[in-house]
Design a protein with these regions (language model features):
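N-terminal FAD cofactor-binding segment of flavoenzymes
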Residues: 34-75
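Glycine-rich FAD pyrophosphate-binding loop
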Residues: 2, 18-37
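Anionic group-transfer/hydrolysis microenvironments
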Residues: 30, 41, 100
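N-terminal Rossmann-fold NAD(P) dinucleotide-binding loop
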Residues: 10-11
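Conserved N-terminal helical subregion
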Residues: 65, 72-129
């Protein structure tokens, strides 16, 4: 199974495919680490990382733990979210991550599971027969 993109969705998908007993590989058009935004994870991400078998690799990096979020509106109103109030089932915390390092950690963990990651490889055409 070919997975296009080595970001979090691609690496988690590839790890789950491998866990299901299928062969897979990832192609990524850029070289890692690379700049990308989106540092704020949500607790629901933790279950996907755990199911994919990638949670321990991320834990080992020692990223900053995050237990909630605060938003200050233009009018000064404050909106606090405490993840322990269980807006969803499961984890009550997550991490704040530097995305370049986070994505590289996930890709490296996939490679350690035997999933080839081909960097600087761009998909330019697909033919389905």
């Amino acid at each position: 199974v070919l997975v296009i993109g080595a970001g979090p969705s691609g690496t988690i998908a590839a790890a789950m495919i491998k866990n299901a007993g299928l062969e897979t590989m990832i192609v990524e058009k850029l070289k890692f680490p690379r700049f990308v935004i989106g540092e704020s994870l949500l607790p629901r991400c933790m279950e996907a990382l755990e199911e994919a078998g990638l949670l321990d690799a991320v834990k080992a990096k020692g990223f900053q733990e995050k237990f909630g979020a605060k938003f200050v509106m233009n009018n000064g109103d404050v909106c606090d979210f405490n993840f322990s109030e269980n807006f969803t089932d499961g984890y009550t915390w997550t991490w704040q991550v530097p995305r370049a390092e986070f994505d590289k950690t996930l890709a490296d963990a996939c490679e350690s599971k035997g999933i080839p990651v081909h960097y600087e490889t761009e998909v330019i055409d697909i033919q389905i027969r």
